[in-house]
């Protein structure tokens, strides 16, 4: 297991701090909290959320909430996409080859289970409830990589193979979550022609800043053109392409927080992976890892702001959506991961990592039930601001209870902690 502790701890503390401040503020004065989050930074701006100005004109206003959720969070999703991309394409990537088969099948169960529980219970509560909450079906599918890792390390010990299994599952879950956001939760009327700008920017920067210099360097051991590109222009071509791609996503109606994903795939990367958010990656000097290192602290601050912007929910907001999200996470996740993991390991013959027991899948499922970050994000786009959104967010916040459940289940199943 690689050293990811410092990154995850910094990520977690600021995010939790922002969420706690938001919760306290919202329960003291909910009106001032909403006034703060929706303060307009730039009226009639070229970017921002669309609305009618009351005179028949559709304009965009850049609010503080939009700035954090739709613009700055694009950097967080870019880092998540970077880890997924490397895990899939690099020679020893953790999601490459047969070793990832069982975690990937278990990930599918970790999505099917929560969706089935969420929609199933909502259906039995009646058509009124079902119609009100159905669009939130994706909220309990999320697994928060950082918090799941922290709890998994606490339950299993840093050296236990179940922790690596959990990380593979969480990062595959992140990849699936990005797809769900892009496909099922557009941010407005779809205008897919604008995606030509995004993918055109990605193709252009890949050809001009990545492929062409390497092509011209054939036979040149000093790789002068690639070195000049890296030393003189650095990340700037990709930053400009990222701005164009983000704008294309915003105009297309897809969620703009995903707007940097096409650009991530074009950036020169290392030929090997050290692990998820690994500290060993400081020894890699490819542009993709260099950019991730530079973004580390800004993204920690952004996540703190994200917690502040999204976790401000009054406790009186608890409702049916709260319990549906919790049921999806606390029941659907463990059941789905165990059943699909068993299916992969036994009938399909894919097996489990050496040192893992079948019962460990139940504990992994409990740990993976911590949704928080991505669950909050999905709740904010699945529902319009109001009681249902607030209730769903409360369910995402309460998913921290999965940490206590995981510790208890770990004790009951006699997990033997393995430290490095």
From Swiss-Prot:
InterPro entries: Na/H_antiporter_dom_sf, NhaA
Origin superkingdom: Bacteria
Stated name of the protein: Na(+)/H(+) antiporter NhaA
Xref: Gene3D superfamilies: Na+/H+ antiporter like domain
Signal peptide range: none
Biological function: Na(+)/H(+) antiporter that extrudes sodium in exchange for external protons.
Key words, A-Z: Antiport, Cell inner membrane, Cell membrane, Ion transport, Membrane, Sodium, Sodium transport, Transmembrane, Transmembrane helix, Transport
Pfam (any one): Na_H_antiport_1
Coiled coil: none
PANTHER family: NA(+)_H(+) ANTIPORTER NHAA (PTHR30341:SF0), SODIUM ION/PROTON ANTIPORTER NHAA-RELATED (PTHR30341)
One of the record's GO cellular component terms: plasma membrane
Residues that span the membrane, as ranges: 4-24, 70-90, 104-124, 132-152, 165-185, 192-212, 233-250, 299-319, 323-343, 361-381, 395-415
Its membrane topology: Multi-pass membrane protein
Family per record: Belongs to the NhaA Na(+)/H(+) (TC 2.A.33) antiporter family.
Alphabetized HAMAP family for the sequence: NhaA
GO biological process, one term: regulation of pH
Reaction catalysed by this enzyme: Na(+)(in) + 2 H(+)(out) = Na(+)(out) + 2 H(+)(in)
GO molecular-function terms, A-Z: sodium:proton antiporter activity
Location within or outside the cell: Cell inner membrane
């Amino acid at each position: 297991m690689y050293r990811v502790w410092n990154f995850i701890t910094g990520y977690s503390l600021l995010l939790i701090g922002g969420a706690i401040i938001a919760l306290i503020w919202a329960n003291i004065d909910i009106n001032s909290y909403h006034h703060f989050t929706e303060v307009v930074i730039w009226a009639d701006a070229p970017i921002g959320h669309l609305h009618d100005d009351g005179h028949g004109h559709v304009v965009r206003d850049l609010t503080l909430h939009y700035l954090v959720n739709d613009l700055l969070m694009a950097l967080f999703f870019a880092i998540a996409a970077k880890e997924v991309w490397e895990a899939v394409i690099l020679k020893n990537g953790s999601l490459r080859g047969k070793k990832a088969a069982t975690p990937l099948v278990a990930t599918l169960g970790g999505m099917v289970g929560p969706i089935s529980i969420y929609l199933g219970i909502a259906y039995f509560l009646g058509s009124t409830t079902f119609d009100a909450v159905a669009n939130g079906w994706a909220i309990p599918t999320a697994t928060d990589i950082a918090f799941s890792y922290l709890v998994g390390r606490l339950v299993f010990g840093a050296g236990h193979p179940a922790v690596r299994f959990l990380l593979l599952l969480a990062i595959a879950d992140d990849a699936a979550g990005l797809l769900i956001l892009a496909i099922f939760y557009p941010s407005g009327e779809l205008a897919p022609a604008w995606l030509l700008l995004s993918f055109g920017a990605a193709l252009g920067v890949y050809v001009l800043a990545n492929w062409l210099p390497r092509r011209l360097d054939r036979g040149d051991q000093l790789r002068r053109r690639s070195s000049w590109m890296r030393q003189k222009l650095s990340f700037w071509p990709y930053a400009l392409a990222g701005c164009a791609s983000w704008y294309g996503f915003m105009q297309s109606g897809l969620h703009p927080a995903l707007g940097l994903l096409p650009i991530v795939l074009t950036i020169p990367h290392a030929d090997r992976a050290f692990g998820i958010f690994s500290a060993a990656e400081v020894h890699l000097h490819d542009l993709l890892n260099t950019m991730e290192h530079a973004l580390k602290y800004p993204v920690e601050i952004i996540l703190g702001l994200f917690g502040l912007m999204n976790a401000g929910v009054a406790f009186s907001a608890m409702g049916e959506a709260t319990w549906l999200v919790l049921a999806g996470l606390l029941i659907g996740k463990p059941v789905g991961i165990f059943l699909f993991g068993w299916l992969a390991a036994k009938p399909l013959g894919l097996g489990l990592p050496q040192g893992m027991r079948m019962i460990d899948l139940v504990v992994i499922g409990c740990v993976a039930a911590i949704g928080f970050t991505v669950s909050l994000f999905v709740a904010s786009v699945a529902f319009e601001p109001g009681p249902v959104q607030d209730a769903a967010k409360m369910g995402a916040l309460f998913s921290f209870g999965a940490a206590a459940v995981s510790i208890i289940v770990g004790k009951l199943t006699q997990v033997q902690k393995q430290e490095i």
